[in-house]
Amino acid sequence: MAKKDNGPLVAATNRKAYHNYHILDTYEAGIELLGSEVKSIRKKEVSLDGAFVRIEGMQAYVFNMHINPYKYNTVTEVEPLRQRRLLLNKKEINKLKGHAEIKGHTIIPLEVYFKNGWAKIKVGLGKGKQLFDKRDAIKKRDLSREMEKDFKNKIKF
């Protein structure tokens, strides 16, 4: 019998990225990992807090992505915060590099997930939000929640 595909298995999301940045564009990239790191990601022992992407030469790397060491690993000890290479096309790297050089723009990892058995990372091109932008977003979110509550209460009666 064929195995059901329930969509991608999301291991970690970077919620602060959506709060601190306007996400202009997103890209899907593969990650160069060791075997024990893949096992840890499958167990959702990965954190994207403070992670960022930097392009060095013609390669993209993710820094500060914390992957807990797999506790049953006996072969080699893996550093949890090591830099990991992202697998992107040359065209995508050039595009990201050009946009990242603009003042106020940065490349941020948004999600780590599995797609067809392969570990992927969703990378976003972000522009930093100002304090008033963040306050605006919070006000809009609160207003929409209140409107939904009022609407639900009207339907009940």
Curated annotation (Swiss-Prot):
Pfam families (UniProt xref): SmpB
GO terms under cellular component: cytosol
CDD domains reported in the protein's UniProt record: SmpB
GO biological process, alphabetically ordered: trans-translation
Keyword tRNA-binding: no
Molecular function GO labels: RNA binding
Location of this chain's protein in the cell: Cytoplasm
Keywords of the record: Cytoplasm, RNA-binding
Family, as annotated: Belongs to the SmpB family.
Free-text function comment from the UniProt entry: Required for rescue of stalled ribosomes mediated by trans-translation. Binds to transfer-messenger RNA (tmRNA), required for stable association of tmRNA with ribosomes. tmRNA and SmpB together mimic tRNA shape, replacing the anticodon stem-loop with SmpB. tmRNA is encoded by the ssrA gene; the 2 termini fold to resemble tRNA(Ala) and it encodes a 'tag peptide', a short internal open reading frame. During trans-translation Ala-aminoacylated tmRNA acts like a tRNA, entering the A-site of stalled ribosomes, displacing the stalled mRNA.
Record protein name field: SsrA-binding protein
